[in-house]
Amino acid sequence: MRIGVLALQGDIEEHEQAIRDSSRSLGFKVDVVRVKRPGDLKGLSGILIPGGESTTIWKLSQGELMLALRDEILNGLPAMGTCAGAIFMAKEVKDRVVGETGQGILGLMDMTVIRNYYGRQRESFEMDLNLEGIGSVRAVFIRAPAIVRIWGKANALSELNGTYPAVIQDNMLALTFHPELTTSKVHEWFLRELVLK
């Protein structure tokens, strides 16, 4: 089994380690590959879209990689997006300060995301968060977005003051926090429930 990590920016190594730890825990071997070009998507069983600065990631991909990624996910490739990854997966994105962003997105999930919802770096925080089907995890929110509205096929796995830190829709899981910094429980759930099914 091959799991890809979009490797343009963000906690790439931490996601790779969380996937390896999860596969050991589940009792199977996984090859983790870094995805930097459309051709790297071939033969994947799932993909992680890490956090980072969303407009920078889009520019680094030249859009071409993201469009190929979108096609793969629409064709059933299981995907997990954290922080900026959740922004890319949303059908609607706004910014806390400027409103409409016009930034490139994949537009896959029935949800509205507000970038930098909690403010700047100094407003970053950690908390224990209960995720349906996963349990309690230590959630790290770093310049985090917030999912403020869901509709259609999107379902919340948790709620936080009127926002949804974890949302699932079909083969996609979006998280506004960074699970890779504290636990592999979320990655394990992703592998078990979305990749192996």
From Swiss-Prot:
Catalysed reactions listed for this entry: aldehydo-D-ribose 5-phosphate + D-glyceraldehyde 3-phosphate + L-glutamine = pyridoxal 5'-phosphate + L-glutamate + phosphate + 3 H2O + H(+); L-glutamine + H2O = L-glutamate + NH4(+)
SUPFAM superfamilies: Class I glutamine amidotransferase-like
GO MF term set: glutaminase activity; pyridoxal 5'-phosphate synthase (glutamine hydrolysing) activity
Family: Belongs to the glutaminase PdxT/SNO family.
UniProt key word Electron transport: no
EC number: 4.3.3.6, 3.5.1.2
Sequence positions that bind L-glutamine: G52, E53, S54, R115, I142, R143
Name of the featured protein: Pyridoxal 5'-phosphate synthase subunit PdxT
Residue numbers annotated as active site: C83, H178, E180
Organism: Korarchaeum cryptofilum (strain OPF8)
Keywords assigned by UniProt, alphabetized: Glutamine amidotransferase, Hydrolase, Lyase, Pyridoxal phosphate
PANTHER family xrefs: PYRIDOXAL 5'-PHOSPHATE SYNTHASE SUBUNIT SNO, PYRIDOXAL 5'-PHOSPHATE SYNTHASE SUBUNIT SNO1-RELATED
Any GO BP: pyridoxal phosphate biosynthetic process
Pathway, per record: Cofactor biosynthesis; pyridoxal 5'-phosphate biosynthesis
CDD domains attached to this UniProt entry: GATase1_PB
Subunit structure: In the presence of PdxS, forms a dodecamer of heterodimers. Only shows activity in the heterodimer.
A GO cellular-component term linked to this record: cytosol
Role noted for this protein: Catalyzes the hydrolysis of glutamine to glutamate and ammonia as part of the biosynthesis of pyridoxal 5'-phosphate. The resulting ammonia molecule is channeled to the active site of PdxS.
Organism ancestry: Archaea, Thermoproteota, Candidatus Korarchaeia, Candidatus Korarchaeales, Candidatus Korarchaeaceae
